[in-house]
From Swiss-Prot:
Enzyme class of the recorded protein, top EC level: lyase
Organism: Chlorobaculum tepidum (strain ATCC 49652 / DSM 12025 / NBRC 103806 / TLS) (Chlorobium tepidum)
Cofactor(s) needed for function: thiamine diphosphate
Family: Belongs to the XFP family.
Gene Ontology BP, a term: carbohydrate metabolic process
Pfam families for this protein: XFP (PF03894), XFP_C (PF09363), XFP_N (PF09364)
Keyword Lyase: yes
The protein's name in its UniProt record: Probable phosphoketolase
EC nos: 4.1.2.-
Length: 791
């Protein structure tokens, strides 16, 4: 090797290799041992866990990178956050955070000595202990890595608007085969070195997944190099299996990469260079299960898929495996690494950074510590003047867009708010954001482009996965964000939502040192009832059903019926912490029902009787309760009420509108739930309830099944009927229209029985006219198009 490739002195090389051995020893101990952590006595059955869980294969590589990043931090005084894409290598991160002293500060019972080491080993993947992955309980983690694909987008999200932060992102070669990860490579086209930090991707090629080779490990060097160049990176290769050689190569490569990062940032921040740079990245090829047993039961282990999880698992009852484990553990020579009391030797402790520079204690990984309140204008100032219900038409998102625009403006200096979306910001009627900012764009630009800028704060890439990953990384490191998306296509990130909801559940309820972060706010529009022009593929309101499966401590669902209520809900969501808020509202021109103060009162309650639409106030109990949730169901309900007033003026109708869907659940099930007495007072205990709902109707039954009057509840909603047709035909196809609602009342209100036949005939006639009209003219009937609440 030349001098340029050997930056480590013999002494430093020995120390770094020893530190790596210590991390590997602790990792194996976590997987296998529950006692005898320093092997002071011969290994026996009582020392071995009864159930061996964990993943060894990726772990030594993660440990190797950690010690090298520690060297970079010490030498350059950098802030680096470690993101482990192969989060199943949980033992590695736990081991390193313990070695640097952070773990014992967060968990004093896991002390920095032999007793603490024993507890460290015993607790791993053990009942009452810690999970097997880089879970929220791991200091320094913002990425559990259980579900693969999101490491790189999380890394970029973390460094946006964090100019002094570097995210070292380890990408497993299995993870690199996922769709989200493949797209996330393009995040470098959105990273501005002047105002953002940097990401150092490390593609860890250990060759195998659970039982198969990985694609990127089996293509040629040239093909892989060209792939990374094509993504816009400058790849460096560190490949081999000899530890001493690999340490020198990795140290030299990391020095070069961090030199290049510093130069890229200097040129952007000092020289004013604006073109997109080629950011460095590392391809790190090492054996799977490196330093582990080479052969188990006559079959290859190290460098094979067989080392992916536990290389051998019958230790307690297999003397050969017991001896193999003991030999493996002793190969790390723990007596050279720890004192007799289990304390890491002082010269090895010196390799770790100090204080908040430690990757396990970096404040960015506990974003709530850094979170600052958004500066926000009074949302009431953006409201629509509604003199009377149904007297004004408007596109609900537009006032919200002006509100978001000014939030962007007021927080320009703090640089802690961004809006995310898959190429839909303008389509979703949020275009007024562009009066204040632009779309972030570091790739090539043409004179004809619209609102592209190196300094934009609207993040658009046609990948819901990448948008979600960016936003999660941004929130987890202490900032605020807003995600707008077509309702049907938010399903693309169903699983990412799952993982973030799980993270919030654990951090909020089980880990007191994790400070609350800003909520993840979804605005879903272009929704099912106004996707008549795009057709069946764009018609799906089921994300709500998916969301409500999660813990009530985490999720909130809002269905504001008009623009002023949308403003009120948005204001509330942006101020909230540790939630996932889902807001669903249409973007097409629609009637406005509530003045601003009425909207605020209604949204604060989450549910309420609309007295102006009801006629039962002084008449005792109503004959029927007509409930609605969602803007189009609200419109159809009010249209049905107007028809019923004409056909059955004596009918006492109570109109209930639901903004906060979780109010329907009992108070014991959700903190927003109505008490049973309040629910019964509003919905009665024995009168028919006709409920027009935005989504799949059975969700309402599920939320209300414990309520007294559930047996009288009849729900209309989306029944998976759709095509390219007219807006009103969409609700007719799903029997959510005003005419079907009128028929439902006629069928269920006993006092209407004498005239029910006439009412239902009226309904049938109108539905026939509707179908004939749209077939002939291609648009809805004038009485539908021109309908208004006002007389």
């Amino acid at each position: 090797m030349t001098e340029m490739t050997t930056p480590l002195s013999p002494r430093e090389l020995d120390l770094m290799n020893a530190y790596w051995r210590a991390a590997n020893y602790l990792s194996v101990g976590q997987i296998y041992l529950m006692d005898n952590p320093l092997l002071k006595e011969p290994l026996s059955k009582e020392h071995i866990k009864p159930r061996l869980l964990g993943h060894w294969g990726t772990t030594p590589g993660l440990n190797f990178l950690y010690v090298h990043l520690n060297r970079i931090i010490r030498n350059r005084d950098l802030d680096i956050i470690y993101i482990a894409g192969p989060g199943h290598g949980g033992p590695a991160l736990v081991a390193n955070v313990w070695l640097e002293g952070t773990y014992s500060e967060y968990y004093p019972d896991v002390s920095f000595d032999e007793a603490g080491m024993k507890r460290l080993f015993r607790q791993f993947s053990f009942p009452g202990g810690i999970p097997s992955h880089v879970a929220p309980a791991t200091p320094g983690s913002i990425h559990e890595g259980g579900e693969l694909g999101y490491a790189l987008s999380h890394a970029y999200g973390a460094v946006f608007d964090n100019p002094d932060l570097v995210a070292a992102c380890v990408i497993g070669d299995g993870e690199a085969e996922t769709g989200p990860l493949a797209t996330a490579w393009h995040s470098n086209k959105f990273l501005n070195p002047k105002r953002d930090g940097a990401v150092l991707p490390v593609l860890h090629l250990n060759g195998y997944k659970i039982a198969n080779p990985t694609v990127l490990a089996r293509i040629s060097h040239e093909e892989l190099e060209q792939l990374m160049i094509g993504y816009g990176y400058k790849p460096y290769f560190v490949e081999g299996d000899d530890p001493a050689t690999m340490h020198q190569m990795m140290a030299a490569t990391m020095d070069r990469c961090f030199d290049e990062i510093a130069e890229i940032q200097r040129r952007a921040r000092v020289d004013g260079v604006t073109e997109r740079p080629m950011w460095p990245m590392i391809v790190f090829r090492s054996p799977k299960g490196w330093t582990g047993p080479k052969v188990v039961d006559g079959k290859p282990a190290e460098g094979s898929w067989r080392s992916h999880q536990v290389p051998f698992s019958t230790v307690r009852d297999n003397p050969e495996h017991m001896a193999l484990l003991e030999t493996w553990l002793k190969s790390y020579r723990a007596e050279e690494l720890f004192t007799a009391d289990g304390v890491l030797l002082p010269e090895l402790q010196e390799l770790a950074p100090r204080g908040k520079k430690r990757m396990g204690d970096i404040p960015h990984a506990n974003g709530g510590l850094l979170l600052k309140e958004l500066r926000m204008p009074d949302f009431r100032e953006y409201g629509i003047d509604v003199p009377k219900p149904g007297s004004v038409e408007a596109e609900a998102p537009k006032p919200m867009a002006r509100f978001l625009r000014d939030i962007m403006k007021m927080n320009e200096k703090a640089a802690n708010f961004r809006v995310f979306g898959p190429d839909e910001t303008a389509s979703n009627r949020l275009g007024e954001l562009f009066e204040e900012t632009d779309r972030t764009w570091m790739a090539g630009m043409l004179p004809t482009d619209d609102h592209l800028s190196r300094d934009g704060r609207v993040m658009e890439i046609l990948s819901e996965h990448t948008c979600q990953g960016w936003l999660e990384g941004y929130l987890l490191t202490g900032r605020h964000g807003f995600f707008s998306c077509y309702e049907a296509f938010i399903h693309i990130i169903d699983s990412m939502f799952n993982q973030h909801a799980k993270w919030l559940k654990v951090t909020g309820a089980e880990i007191p040192w994790r400070r609350p972060i800003a909520s993840l706010n979804y605005f879903l529009t272009s929704h099912v009832w106004r996707q008549d022009h795009n057709g069946f593929s764009h018609q799906d309101p089921g994300f709500i059903d998916h969301v409500v499966n999660k813990k009530s401590s985490v999720i909130r669902v809002y269905l504001p019926p008009d623009a002023n209520s949308l403003l009120s809900v948005t204001n509330h969501c942006l101020r909230s912490r540790n939630y996932i808020n889902v807001i669903v509202a249409g973007k097409q021109p629609a009637w406005q029902w509530l003045d601003m103060e009425s909207a605020v009162r209604h949204c604060t309650s989450g549910i309420g009787i609309w007295e102006w639409a009801s006629n039962d106030a002084n008449e005792g109990e109503p004959d029927v309760v007509m409930a609605c949730a969602g803007d189009v169901p609200t419109l159809e309900t009010l249209a049905a009420v107007k028809i019923l007033r004409k056909l059955a003026p004596e009918l006492k109708i109570r109109v209930v509108n639901v903004v906060d869907l979780m109010t329907l659940q009992p108070k014991e099930e959700h903190p927003h739930g109505l008490a049973d007495r309040d629910f019964d007072d509003m919905f009665t205990t024995d009168k028919p309830i006709i409920f027009a709902y935005h989504g799949y109707p059975w969700l309402i039954h599920r939320l209300t099944y414990r309520r007294t009057n559930h047996h009288n509840l009849h729900v209309r909603g989306y029944k998976e009927e759709g095509t390219t047709t007219t807006p009103f035909d969409m609700v007719v196809m799903n029997e959510l229209d005003r005419f079907h609602l009128v028929a439902d009342v006629a069928n269920r209100v006993e006092s209407l029985r004498p005239q029910a036949a006439y009412i239902k005939q009226y309904v049938r006639d109108r539905l026939i006219e509707h179908k004939e009209y749209i077939t002939k003219y291609g648009e809805d009937m004038p009485e539908v198009r021109d309908w208004r609440w006002e007389d």
